From Swiss-Prot:
Organism field: Oenococcus oeni (strain ATCC BAA-331 / PSU-1)
InterPro entries: ARFGAP/RecO, DNA_rep/recomb_RecO_N, NA-bd_OB-fold, RecO, RecO_C
GO cellular component: bacterial nucleoid
Keyword terms, alphabetized: DNA damage, DNA recombination, DNA repair
Name under which the protein is recorded: DNA repair protein RecO
Function: Involved in DNA repair and RecF pathway recombination.
Keyword flag Cytoplasm: no
Gene name as annotated: recO
């Protein structure tokens, strides 16, 4: 019996001269790896269908426990074209996919996260800021990793509105009145903390446009990276690539050919 796997291709690796290993995220069985037989052959129906960030229906066999599934054919597939053509958009989309793969075991029903991921890819492909979309995922996935910083109120006085900074010592936000209690608070941009809090509960589908300054985005990313580095111990390969690209842009901001 042939199984139907509906989902999004999030990883493609060479396996043999004619075959590839394809990782697909699906709402019902989560993230799994499949052997795409003959996908590297010129006339294979899977050649185009198994490109990165292609989505649709694939046919083959579900993976057995601790094993590979396989794919023989596909149907009604499409691709997020702009993501596939732009190295930066691709990197942010891959970063989100790597976070999801780290957060969930294989064969896990993750329908909520799957549809959130699909919405994220649509937004990135349509031109919304990929860093902002990735930040929403980074923040909302924290609880899945077992990390839940307090982003809703100052733990000392219960303050929920006003200016805040992030404190490792208090594992969350600290109001301006209590800055003196933590000399090692992050000194983050107050607007970055505002977005940190907002992104913890916003839905991707609510984003139609958003404009955040580069300084605020850098400050927000610094807070998020600190949490992932020190409390989770996770740094994706795509995040490393993004940081390398960002450092080049800072080093050569006006480099152009005439």
């Amino acid at each position: 019996m042939v199984d139907k796997i509906s989902g999004i291709v999030i990883s493609v690796r060479d396996y043999s001269e004619n075959d590839s290993l394809i990782k697909i995220i699906s709402p019902t069985i989560g993230i799994n790896t499949y052997l795409a037989r003959g996908s590297k052959k010129t006339k294979s129906s899977l050649k185009i269908a198994t490109q990165l960030f292609t989505y649709g229906d694939f046919f083959g066999k579900y993976p057995k426990k601790n094993g590979l599934g396989y794919l023989n054919s596909s149907e009604s597939t499409s691709i997020f074209k702009n993501i596939s053509l732009d190295i930066i958009l691709n990197a942010y989309a891959s970063h989100i996919a790597e976070l999801l793969a780290a957060a969930f075991d294989e064969n896990t029903n993750i329908d909520q996260w799957y549809f959130m991921f699909f919405q994220a890819l649509k937004k990135i492909d349509a031109g919304l800021d990929p860093q902002v979309i990735a930040n929403v995922f980074e923040i909302q996935l924290l609880s899945v990793f077992g990390v839940e910083p307090n982003l809703f109120s100052d733990p000392i006085n219960g303050q929920t509105e006003g200016e805040f900074d992030f404190s490792e010592q208090y594992n969350g936000i600290l109001s301006k009145k209590n800055y003196h209690l933590d000399d090692r608070r992050l000194h983050a941009n107050p607007k970055a903390i505002y977005y940190l809090r907002m992104f913890s509960k916003i839905k991707i589908s609510q984003f139609n446009s958003i404009n955040i300054s580069e300084n605020v985005k850098r400050s927000l990313q610094r807070v998020i990276n600190l949490i992932y580095d020190r409390q989770i111990g996770l740094k994706t390969r795509s995040r490393t690539f993004i940081e390398q690209m960002n450092s080049l842009q800072i080093k050569y901001p006006n480099d152009s050919s005439n």
